[in-house]
Each structure stands twice: as structure tokens, then as C-alpha cells.
Amino acid sequence: MIRCIRKLFTLAVVLVLLAAFGYSVVLPRVLPLQYRDIVEQYAAEYGLEEAFVYGVIFCESHFEPDVISSADAIGLMQVTEETGKWAAAQMGLDPATIDLTDPDTNIHIGCWYLSWLNEKFGGVSETVLAGYNAGHGSVARWLADEEMSWDGITLDEIPYEETKSYVKRVKLAEQAYRLRLRLQAYLEETPLGVYAD
């Protein structure tokens, strides 16, 4: 009986260690929480869910601040220079001085733009993401087309395959980050913060 209890105890310890290892080593690599303070600040400032912002960053740049796409989108949230300068002017910033490779600037402008799209498109996250990817002008045209939107608010059809795929990927990443952030909050509340990043 004592031998069985020792084996079960040993097994339990091994499982706990594996779970801790998996959380502390694997999860931060699969779903990183880089730039957390910046994401928290601007998500809160612009009424966005952190998981939503992380989903966009994950899909846009995989947390590489200096990445430039083939469409010349720059940084963590892949903001084009044109959109960045327009957004900066709308935000009361000097468009001539913005550096879209700077994580703070990029996330600030990206969150502002998501918030602007959110307001423009009635808070429908799929429509907001389509606007972020394909441009708000394209989405406005799609919403006006009865074949693509029955109510002028939601998109029943997204004609660009890239945008359709993008929306699905970001929504999936958002769900994963929602769980990751809940788990992170729970583990940060454990005694001594044993499993916190």
C-alpha cells in the first residue's frame, strides 16, 4: 500500500513538473506575450480586448518589430506608412516623426486604427479585421453590396481569399490568446507566482 502511494506521489510530482515545464518553456514560445505593458496600455486606452490585439500582432508579424511586408506594411501590427501618417495626424501626433518600427509607436497607431475601424464598422470584429487587412474603403464597398452583406453591417461574403483567411487566422489566434491570458492571470495568482512568465 505504501509502495503504491509512493508511486502515485512520484507520478503526481512528475506530472506537475511536466505541466510547469510545458507552461514555462513551450507556451511562451508558441503564444508569446511580448510587449505586454504596451499592449495592455493601448488596448485599454482604445477599448480593445488584449487577446484581439495579440491575435493581430501574432498573425501580422509574429512579434518581429522590424519586419516589412511585400506590401510595405511595417512593424508589429504591419501598419503601412500611408496609414501610419494618416492615423498619426488624426491622433494629434506629428506624422513626420513617427517610427513604425518602434514597438510603442506601432502598437499605439495599430490599436488606434483598430478602434477607429471598430467604431466605423459597428463593433463587428470580423468586419474590423477585414478592414484592417483589405482597407476600410474596400470593406465599405462590400457592406454596400447586398450580395456580400444582407444588413450593411456584417460581411456574409469576403471576396478576397487573403482577407477571408486573415480574418479566420486572427479570430483563431484571438481565442488562443484569450485562453493564454486567462491561464497567465490564474498562474500569477498562485502562491509565489511559481508559473508566471
Model regions: which residues?
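Short, Lys/Arg-rich N-terminal segment immediately upstream of the first membrane anchor
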Residues: M1-R6
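Hydrophobic membrane-insertion alpha-helices, especially the h-region
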Residues: K7-V25
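Catalytic glycan-binding domains that act on GlcNAc-containing polysaccharides
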Residues: A20-D197
